[in-house]
């Protein structure tokens, strides 16, 4: 839940944002927000998150927080790009995605004329990006080669090597054999990370609000399930 009570302009100023844009598509009912934090290093790149928010304030808080993080992610990676993010506000948790919704989002993204480049995030996959690509060229992460493909395996690989570096820093070597790892969230990135850790010999404790994701982690990687409220207290390395 959102904790800040400042106005939208005050929140933007505090985080250093350039733009915060709202959109409603009458035909599909799409409600979406794009936040551009910075274009100092180039056009702003950031994923599209499709999520159920309990309030508009929660959605604004999330998109501002995430877009600022993207600025630093791009900069630390040496990319000539700025940071942005977008969120699609689902009317309820079980609201199914449609091509019409994705194309409406694509049209919204296209209004930025490349200043914002969308990509995958929670609730958005390669098919959704390909649907968006019917309306705009300013997307990455679709199924076609020209759109870059699913970034989840590469994100997971980066996290895996980051965890290995943490083991070394802690004086625990770089071997995951016998180590216990707790993962909060086992969606696209989480499943790929589970696979890498399992193959490296780690024992897994997982938590997720999606039962299908949990079942996959248990069946394929022998993971132990923890409640989402308990995962941060799980005994692990």
Residue ranges of model-derived segments:
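Glycine-rich phosphate/diphosphate-binding loop of Rossmann-like nucleotide-binding domains
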Residues: 150-237
